[in-house]
Amino acid sequence: MPRREDIKRILVIGSGPITIGQAAEFDYSGTQALKALKSAGYEVIIVNSNSATIMTDPEFSDAVYIEPLTVEFLEEIIKKERPDALLPTLGGQTALNLAVELAESGILDRYGVQLIGAKLESIKKAEDRELFKKTMEEAGLEVLRSRLVNNLTDALETAREFGYPVIIRPSFTLGGTGGGVAFNEEELREIVTKGLIESPVHTVLIEESVIGWKEYELEVVRDGAGNFIVVCSIENLDPMGIHTGDSITVAPSQTLTDVEYQRMRDAAYKVIDAIGIETGGSNIQFAVDPKTGRMVVIEMNPRVSRSSALASKATGYPIAKIAALLAVGFTLDEIPNYITGKTLAAFEPSIDYVVVKIPRFQLEKFPGADPRLNTQMKSVGEVMAIGRTFKEALGKALRSLELDAAPKLDLDHIREHLANPTPERISYIFAAFRNGMDVEEVHELTKIDRWFLREMKACIDLEEELKEKKFDVEVLRKAKQWGYSDREIAEIWQVSEKDVRKMREKNRIFPVYKMVDTCAAEFEAQTPYYYSTYNGVENEAIPTDKEKIMILGSGPNRIGQGIEFDYTNVHGVWAFQEEGYEAIMVNSNPETVSTDYDTSDRLYFEPLTVEDVLEIVRNEKPKGVVVAFGGQTPLRIARHLVEEGVNIIGTSFESIEIAEDREKFAKLLKRIGLRCPPFGTASSVEEALKVAEDLGYPVLVRPSYVLGGRAMAIVDTPEELERYVREAAIVSPGYPILIDKFLEDAIELDVDVVSDGKYVWIAGLMEQIEEAGVHSGDSACVLPPVSLSEKLVEEIEKTVHRLVKALKIVGIANIQMAVKDEEIYIIEANPRASRTVPFVSKAIGIPVAKIAAKIMVGRSLPELLSEYFPYPTRPGTKVDKLGDSEILPTPWPRMFSVKEVVIPFHKFPGTDVLLGPEMRSTGEVMGIGEDFAEAFAKAEIAAGNPLPTEGAILATIADKDKRDAIPLLAHLADMGFEIYATKGTAKALQSHGVDVKVVPKVGEGRPDVIDLLEQGKISLVVITQSSDEPSLVAVSHGKDPFKVEGRRTVGYMIRTTALKRKIPYLTTVEALRAAVAAIRKMKRGSIVKVRKLTDTWKM
């Protein structure tokens, strides 16, 4: 079946902001699909609210819309662009849910748009738990006993009938949100109540428990002619009961017999057939009872998913690209296998290596959250590693996680930790074996298959052998084949990593590189995609004689280092290719565009450690290595690379050192006459109190050695400082604590700047909406800035110029500053690309990272910018040609862009939602408008926090904020909002003549503030933190060894109730000010205006 000629224009919906359960894998899938559809001759329109994506770059489609992903905005885009078809299978759960809404509300029919890639009926059969169960039973497939309920009474009755434990799964939610496992009635009440709120249709499925069964997934593809292939089988090392996104997974599956696999394969075909998936990729999950072999179908996703991204990277088979072509009528035997170039996509991939994926967690960012893993996903990223054996792949994957220190284990409670898995579970399994437990005991507690446990125990036995035979060459060779790093061997031998490397080199123990080719080396691959192994002789990565640039990626997604850095990496790759170099990418993250087989010239899927990078350098001998695009990951290993003679291009390592070292940086600022907030260091509690007294409170404290992840805090009093130092940090001469004067009421600015060593260009000058003290990664920001005077902007440009020249920046840097009383303070400078680069590039219409990369290989800045000149500059400034001054003109777009963040608080009930100096957001959205108010309102809608235009507001304002907040609340009252307030706030409002209803605080009478929220009477909560509300850990609740730290102040209860009830909330005066402007704009008329991204640059 050739391509469909009845379709010309296709609308693709992206997945929106990165959240837990829906991450960078959808940018990877989307980008692949857009490329495929364009090359097949279709016009493509893409809509996504996330600017930090390659798929929203204008090169990949005919029209890009960065707009909120809601039905109202999508209808406007459909009305304007008139697509023939909508492809909803590339944007995760978000896009599927929207497709269902657009179809059911009649919008698709009204504009004559047809769904391709998945029919409405199929989406519903796969997503609606009750329908899915019925469909499976009709197809003769076994599913778990379950019942759909919409109230607590029915849930309790069902659980009694099935017997505890039971699994609770809310309908139509992402990453298991709101679900869980209930072992008793009390837990059931809690989970069901939450699940009914989280489910958009307010139903949950109560399901019999299969905890401890083995979990498998098949990634399958089917075309319109009925051809069906299994791309990859994936085995979860962790048994059922842990979300597959939080499980360690292995491909291909290791413990299935051939008979079981064939049975599963046949069942998968029946599933796809029964659901009615005619074309595209699907992911099907099975559970197998290890005792009886009983197999049940758990669920299926009728779209590309996290697992399909993993399967694509594991096999080299590009599922998303092929699914997109199948959706427009191609069949598998008409599509080439892009890796071999010789075979067809109808061939099932076969692989001669093992792939291990391990999730990356950051629970320390969410104190108060339960650390135990369950059916609700909690990890923020993942790594993948490839080896010839399971042991080798596991070893490589563990070091790819980039966990700086071994986790602190609670050795008195090993058995509890084995029975209740937490993110440290692998460390506990190793600890159990080191402490003499046997495979059988560990299996009983963990229910992990004995085969995996025997492999892990063998590694611990090898540790003993290493200790006994120190410096034995054969044992060293064996350890390398089993995936041990030089660093781990060095720790066992108590020598330096360098010593082990020297011994290895002397005995010629080197890895060889093997190719990922989809066909177990049966055909020759065209696309160079490699992994290292010590279990091989022949090196398949033969270097070319071209000049090469090697780019170090950013490793697993984590908070503070996410998809934005991958965006920069990819732009870097393209820039070096355009300049005639061979671009080599090194990364370990399977979710990303940078690890796509056709992004770079050569891809090494390897851990980002000194050892692994040096081995690739030894093989490829690049002209230079780029460390400025991957966030902190490459910077952390830069020193070791330089010591080994690796050439780092761009900003020199000396400059990186100065910027990263507080004392050196402060000296440099002093030398060039710039200010930074006064600071001091302390090595004891007494010194800390003295430094703070000299600086004057409030102060910002950060220890150089962190315990329990509470890295930074703003402290207002000596008592708080003393408590902080005793509880949250180790303070000793070896581990000093840094204390900065905290600038209250300052405006914080974020500057992305590019320089070629002579000219300096501020690409983006952003103003943070939250006050200084909220981490810039968690604050919304606006470009161009809204509250800076003409004089101040000129002053900022000169300051940046002076600092960039002094740091000798070549390429890109990010500078954070604060402005207080018209004085400029430098907070920090990062000699690398920052997380705002994609946002700035989309706001100004100039690819900032590409320009920075070309500068690193010798191009000049005015020459590169001339292609985009003239671009809009500040009103009143006139620039005829670039290069008259060393300070190149700062872009000043006529449209306003707001970046807003998305923080996964609802995944971690128990965590306080206050913003502070510790970053916790996982993703971002962008709102574009003709003024700040419109842009902010759209950004809030896109972030899932839409502001109300009517209803009641609950206000409880700290004394220090009343002066600024009361007039703003009065303004909302004038706009017709009803105001409820606690006693002190109400009094202040009444003195301003505002009509207000007084509500008792908790414990001061009923109905109190919490009752009001629970009754659903409030449409917006405004609550700022008061200084008498302790901002430190106080009470602890929960059973050993899973103590949960948390605070239970009234403010905390109000914030968490608002979060739980999905009521929008504002926690700072700045956010309130922005919200008032946005609400006023929304009340004046619709803000549902959509604009093509490229048009916003021409305004």
From Swiss-Prot:
Q: Which Pfam families match?
A: CPSase_L_D2 (PF02786), CPSase_L_D3 (PF02787), MGS (PF02142)
- Residues that bind Mn(2+) 3, according to the entry? Q816, E828
Q: What EC number(s) does the entry state?
A: 6.3.4.16, 6.3.5.5
Reaction(s) catalysed by this chain's protein: hydrogencarbonate + L-glutamine + 2 ATP + H2O = carbamoyl phosphate + L-glutamate + 2 ADP + phosphate + 2 H(+)
Q: Which InterPro entries match?
A: ATP-grasp, ATP_grasp_subdomain_1, CarbamoylP_synth_lsu, CarbamoylP_synth_lsu_oligo, CarbamoylP_synth_lsu_oligo_sf, CbamoylP_synth_lsu-like_ATP-bd, CbamoylP_synth_lsu_CPSase_dom, MGS-like_dom
* Keywords attached to this entry: Amino-acid biosynthesis, Arginine biosynthesis, ATP-binding, Ligase, Magnesium, Manganese, Metal-binding, Nucleotide-binding, Pyrimidine biosynthesis, Repeat
Q: Where is this region: Allosteric domain?
A: 945-1099
Location of the region described as Carbamoyl phosphate synthetic domain in the Swiss-Prot/TrEMBL record: 542-944
Per the UniProt entry, what are the Gene Ontology biological process annotations, in alphabetical order?
'de novo' UMP biosynthetic process; glutamine metabolic process; L-arginine biosynthetic process
The record lists ATP 2 as bound by R702, K741, L743, E748, G773, V774, H775, S776, Q816, E828
Family per similarity comment: Belongs to the CarB family.
- UniProt subunit comment: Composed of two chains; the small (or glutamine) chain promotes the hydrolysis of glutamine to ammonia, which is used by the large (or ammonia) chain to synthesize carbamoyl phosphate. Tetramer of heterodimers (alpha,beta)4.
What functional role does this protein have?
Large subunit of the glutamine-dependent carbamoyl phosphate synthetase (CPSase). CPSase catalyzes the formation of carbamoyl phosphate from the ammonia moiety of glutamine, carbonate, and phosphate donated by ATP, constituting the first step of 2 biosynthetic pathways, one leading to arginine and/or urea and the other to pyrimidine nucleotides.
**How are the domains described in the entry?**
The large subunit is composed of 2 ATP-grasp domains that are involved in binding the 2 ATP molecules needed for carbamoyl phosphate synthesis. The N-terminal ATP-grasp domain (referred to as the carboxyphosphate synthetic component) catalyzes the ATP-dependent phosphorylation of hydrogencarbonate to carboxyphosphate and the subsequent nucleophilic attack by ammonia to form a carbamate intermediate.
* Name this polypeptide is given: Carbamoyl phosphate synthase large chain
Q: Which organism is it from?
A: Thermotoga neapolitana (strain ATCC 49049 / DSM 4359 / NBRC 107923 / NS-E)
Q: Which gene encodes it?
A: carB
